[in-house]
Amino acid sequence: MRRQPPFLLAVVAILLAILVPAVWKVVERLNRPVGPTTGGEPWPGDEPVWHTRHAEFIADSQNGGYDVVCLGDSLTWGWDDHRDVWAERVTRRRTTFHAIGGETTNGLLWRIDHGELDGLDPKLVVLLIGSNNRWVKDDPDDIAGGVAAVVGRLRERLPRANVLLLGLLPQGWTADASSRPVFAEVNRRLAAFDSGPVSVRDVGGCLLEPDGRLSQATSTDGTHLSRGGYERLADALGPLVRERVGD
């Protein structure tokens, strides 16, 4: 049998040394999950703005001195544009809003696990999270389980704080919108968490018309709130927050 030239064997060896690890990296990447499998699994967001805001919130937490910390998704983020409404109708106590558009329980868990609450010692945490989980896993048990995981993490990280857990707010213009029964089931499950320092309140009815519709008086797109929506929400939240932290 003819022997291969030494230089050819050397080239083959070099190619194998380069290609085999690369192939294994591809295989490993293909075997990795592309997202969380349950609502209680910490998982970071994949958008640059998500990581930017997380870093901003870490820096904000180092300032400390907040009486109220509000955590959530775009519905909580919207308070940034209506801080005057919050101050006039909810409380003038020092409040910060740590919220990211499109956030899920997974992302919020990851943020908590990676320093976002470090330096904070609030009297109250207002939590509104879970509606975006529906786009990951449309299952009330899983969504409620994710919210429960967040509440548990808050109790671990901020043991002196009370938690005001809000039920998912209604979405969809009409009373028969597909999200309504899912959110109603989630809220029924969340009610079971009402105990001790954790208070659960379903205030979403304040946003609806008598026939169950969302209207442009409270919503901009059937999901997010208009100024009128934040005013109604503030009137519902005001007594709950002031009872826990004062005016």
Residue ranges and their predicted role:
Residues 36-45, 80, 97-105, 135, ...:
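Acidic/histidine-rich helix-loop elements
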Residues 1-71, 76-82, 242-247:
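N-terminal secretory targeting modules
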Residues 158-165, 204, 237:
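A non-catalytic structural micro-motif
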Residues 77-91, 106-148, 153, 164, ...:
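Oxyanion-hole/transition-state-stabilizing segment in secreted/luminal serine hydrolases
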Residues 96-98, 133-140, 175-177, 219-224:
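Second-shell loop/turn segments in exported
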Residues 70, 99, 103, 107, ...:
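Extracytoplasmic/secreted proteins, especially bacterial periplasmic and envelope-associated proteins
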Residues 170-247:
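Catalytic His-Asp segment of secreted/periplasmic serine-dependent ester chemistry enzymes
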Residues 68-70, 94-99, 124-129, 162-167, ...:
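Structural recognition of the beta-strand scaffold that forms the well-ordered cores
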